[in-house]
Structure formats: structure tokens, C-alpha cells
């Protein structure tokens, strides 16, 4: 499953990032978004969602959220 299907307020663990874009992968890594890290969807709008990673909150678009694969 990916972040677009995650429930708000529930903590998940990042399984992998599905992207061929090295720049995007490096950007996510700089946020602390990589395999094994906990992540929580704080809120969701139509085109974006706010996630919590390592006590920081980030607003990401749905295309980026689809690339972040998670598990419970």
C-alpha cells in the first residue's frame, strides 16, 4: 500500500520508495523518508497530504505520496 491509502493519524513504516527519479529519491532521503522509518499522515487535502517524519511535518503532493510504499 502507499501513502494515498493510509489512514490519518495512524503510524506506518516506510517499506520502499518506488521512483526512478534520482533527484526525487535524494529529496525524500534528505527529509528522512527512507525504508524502515516511521511515517504518519497528519491530514489530507485533494492534491496534497501532510506527513510527519522524525518529529517534522511536510506537505507532499499525491504523486509523491503514491511513490512511498508503507506497511503497518
Residue ranges and their predicted role:
Residues 17-19, 30:
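A structural micro-motif recognizing beta-strand termini
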Residues 43-72:
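C-terminal structural segments of small proteins and small subunits
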Residues 5, 16, 41-43:
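A residue-level detector for short acidic-glycine micro-motifs
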Residues 23-27:
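Short alpha-helix capping/helix-loop boundary micro-motifs
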Residues 1-2, 72:
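Absolute protein N-terminus
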